[in-house]
């Protein structure tokens, strides 16, 4: 009797497996679509990702102007797929993504902006540059900078900058000590607070670092700042981990701002 039961269960299990396989094959594939049709990528120094979350995952890419961006399909070890965009020169072009199985197409506009870097303030007793403020320094001829606040309800930056200004890095010689400075120019009222209709004022901040080599390298790389006097002894070796903390102090005051550089993206439609 037992000899008859065992083959019976084997046949049943094979039948169920075959049915499940047929069900998976007959399950309709979700159409291919994207959440956004507009993307920005900074010039050369970073990659913007377009996540592929539906469709077959078998995607073909066609860039209208390959002198502006480079686009590549990337598949992670976990199986997730995305398109990596890298900016080659400033400008705007389109990228068409085609699902080779479903035939669905999506065309997105891609804008390459000036390179920039973010400085996020973690702690501060400064009246204007307060904690949770994000400062973006742009690598353009004007040396523009933008100040953004956080939308705590949505846990993201507000889309419109709180203020705009310009920046400059320079060095002061204090006896035998060389001190780097960041000069920020922005409109401020008599108390030093941001004010749109007020005249531009210059604010100088002395800089200190937890890891001077790492910070000076990232500033030089993203903003083309020449720190010859400060990095003359820097090596080209990788020294992990790297700490991008930078401390700003206002000379002859007790104001101290502690933050760190990051490659966080600026809200869209801000930069040219």
Question: Predicted regions span which residues?
Answer:
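C-terminal motif of bacterial Sec signal peptides marking the signal peptidase cleavage site
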Residues: 15-18
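Extracytoplasmic soluble-region selector
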Residues: 20-271
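Sec-dependent signal peptide recognition
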Residues: 2-10
């Amino acid at each position: 009797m037992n000899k008859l039961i065992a083959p019976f269960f084997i046949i049943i299990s094979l039948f169920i497996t075959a049915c499940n396989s047929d069900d998976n094959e007959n399950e309709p594939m979700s159409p291919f679509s994207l959440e956004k049709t507009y993307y920005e990528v900074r010039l050369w120094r970073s990659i913007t990702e377009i996540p592929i979350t539906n469709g077959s995952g078998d995607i073909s890419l066609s860039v209208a102007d390959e002198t502006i961006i480079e686009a590549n399909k990337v598949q992670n070890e976990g199986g997730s797929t995305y398109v990596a965009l890298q900016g080659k020169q400033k400008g705007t072009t389109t990228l068409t993504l085609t699902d080779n199985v479903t035939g669905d197409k999506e065309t997105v506009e891609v804008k390459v902006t000036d390179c920039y870097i973010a400085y996020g303030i973690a702690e501060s007793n400064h009246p204007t540059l307060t904690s949770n403020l994000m400062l973006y320094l742009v690598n353009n001829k004007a040396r523009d900078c933008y100040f953004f606040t956080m939308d705590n309800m949505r846990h993201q930056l507000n889309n419109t900058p709180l203020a705009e200004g310009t920046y400059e890095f320079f060095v002061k010689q204090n006896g035998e000590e060389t001190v780097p400075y960041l000069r920020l120019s922005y409109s401020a009222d008599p108390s030093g607070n941001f004010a749109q209709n007020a005249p531009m004022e210059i604010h100088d901040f002395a800089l200190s670092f937890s890891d001077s080599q790492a910070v000076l390298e990232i500033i030089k790389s993203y903003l083309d700042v020449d720190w010859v006097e400060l990095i003359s002894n820097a090596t080209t070796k990788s020294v992990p981990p790297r700490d991008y903390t930078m401390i700003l102090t206002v000379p002859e005051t007790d104001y101290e701002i502690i933050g760190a550089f990051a490659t966080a993206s600026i809200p869209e439609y801000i930069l040219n």
